Curated annotation (Swiss-Prot):
Pfam families: NucS_C (PF01939), NucS_N (PF21003). The lineage of its organism: Bacteria, Bacillati, Actinomycetota, Actinomycetes, Mycobacteriales. The gene is nucS. Cleaves both 3' and 5' ssDNA extremities of branched DNA structures. This is Endonuclease NucS. PANTHER family: ENDONUCLEASE NUCS. It comes from the Bacteria. It comes from Corynebacterium urealyticum (strain ATCC 43042 / DSM 7109). CDD domains: NucS-like (cd22341).
Amino acid sequence: MRLIIATCAVDYVGRLEAHLPRADRLIMVKADGAVSIHADDRAYKPLNWMTPPCTTTEYRRAEALAEATDGKDPFLTLPELEDEDVEALWVVENPKGEQLRIQLFAVHSDQNFDLGEDPGLQKDGVEAHLQELLAEQIEILGEGYSLVRREYPTPIGPVDILTKDATGATVAVEIKRRGNIDGVEQLTRYVELLNRDELLAPVTGVFAAQEIKPQARTLAEDRGIRCVTLDYAAMRGTDDSEFRLF
């Protein structure tokens, strides 16, 4: 884990465009390559981020000037370095060509920490039981769904449930008692990873929970992830309510 406190400006270039003007912020770089930009508010939510797989390349203004030859403009391809106040430019790019372009004006703190391997979030009793019940009642997800397996292993952790829909397409299911943004991010990583497997692709995601926070639902829908609200009592057979599908 690398934590940098810096005066920076950030531009996101991709499906949309977004700009963060010059200010002091926290830049977090994780061991898996993820980069996120944080302000001193908004709780845990970053201002902008890039999830793995992605690459980060650093360009320094002094080096660009030193390498310039034959009168060529050293800033032709890196216009952000033209500002004399900029010390460096980070270009964080994913395979889709989306970029975070981070101008560093001053670095106030730069620290690295080895956190080791995390044991992962342990599901509580309700989540574990929801997974078991949904595997037994997989038709809740839709007519024609069939179970592939529970706890489908991946290099970044097990997918709660892997299924096939009525067309035979692969669907990864993440189950939570309370669905928040972290759960959507987790499922996004699983879907991106599974889509690299030609035997499974194309893979879509379903985010299933007893309760799904509005922000999590918005993020999921923006990423093409379907949300399903689960009625725990009905699934256990202690309630006659119909399952709610959104």
